[in-house]
């Protein structure tokens, strides 16, 4: 069987969030992912998370998603679903750019069995913003999938420039080094 072959090969398995919402404690729910797997919200053959949630889920699946992932309006449904994948025990999590950008069905990569219109979506340069980079990094770092950004150090006031030595100390040093300098000259 495929499962036996996978176990014998040592390769990680795949877990796809979009296969998880069936009303039960499915093995495809993120808390059940084994560590040795790759977690995906969806694959290139699935709709985007937004497209899936809006067009392919039932009311019961949406209700389960809201409860299981503790989805809130403030965080946003897509961000909450991504959080679930990133927080899973999976050693590796892969999220498409279309899902990070919260795109709908217009950004779907491939529809199996449909020979037309596939692999045409491209990310627009205007969508690659510092805010998006920060979101990806913060969510990845929160679940130890990236190094945290270094904390910004508060600006320190410059210390006053060192003051020259007192004249008395300079004179004392000149007295103690003068005989050594004179001896060095006479040795030549």
How would you describe each model-predicted region?
Residues 1-175, 179-188:
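Catalytic cores of glycan-processing enzymes that make or break glycosidic bonds
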